[in-house]
A protein has these predicted regions:
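Domain-level signature for proteins that mediate thiol-based redox and metal-cofactor handling
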Residues: 1-172
Length: 172
């Protein structure tokens, strides 16, 4: 039986790796600049290797155009903080899931005007399609205007109450 990890990874126990994690965790997603890669759950691991630091990330989807920018920003942030040479590895399995997004990240999305994905229930119960909550007025009376929003990981919705369009971060 294969199990897929559906939770965010904890910060490292090792003090040096934890400091490196803390620096890498400050890198923001260039497509959703209100979120860090830690908020998104994209930052997967940090470890020390003989040739430097290895940071692993899992993009929100395999063709994410932000991967190169995130990789460069991690290396730049670590270098600016005085850490030895770093390389970033992109890990595609297990695939990223919105379950890895932190509660803080979900709150930041909503305050930014993007409806966050609903958290998956641990007991396996499937959430009924009750509507996506409008981040502007809180109404559940919304409709999908386009399955594709400003980025591939978002859909465009319109609130029927306040008439405002908004992005919805798709569940994965």
């Amino acid at each position: 039986m294969v199990t897929v990890e559906r939770v965010a990874r904890p910060r490292p126990d090792n003090a040096i790796e934890r400091r490196i994690w803390d620096v890498a965790a400050t890198v923001v997603d260039p497509e959703v600049p209100v979120l860090t890669i830690e908020d998104l759950g994209v930052l997967r691991s940090v470890r020390l290797a003989d040739d430097g630091i290895v940071v692993q990330i899992t993009p929100t989807y395999s063709g994410c155009p932000a991967v190169d920018a995130i990789r460069d920003d991690i290396v730049t942030a670590l270098s600016a903080a005085g850490h030895r040479p770093a390389r970033v590895e992109v890990v595609l399995a297990p695939a990223w899931t919105t379950d890895w997004m932190s509660e803080s990240g979900r709150d930041k999305l909503e305050r930014y005007g993007i409806a966050p994905p609903a958290p998956r229930r641990a007991d396996g119960v499937i959430r009924l399609g009750l509507g996506v909550r409008c981040p502007n007025c809180g109404s559940l009376h919304t409709r999908e205007a386009s399955h594709f929003g400003s980025t591939s990981c978002k859909a465009l919705y319109v609130c029927q109450r306040c008439q405002e369009p908004f992005d919805y971060f798709k569940e994965h």
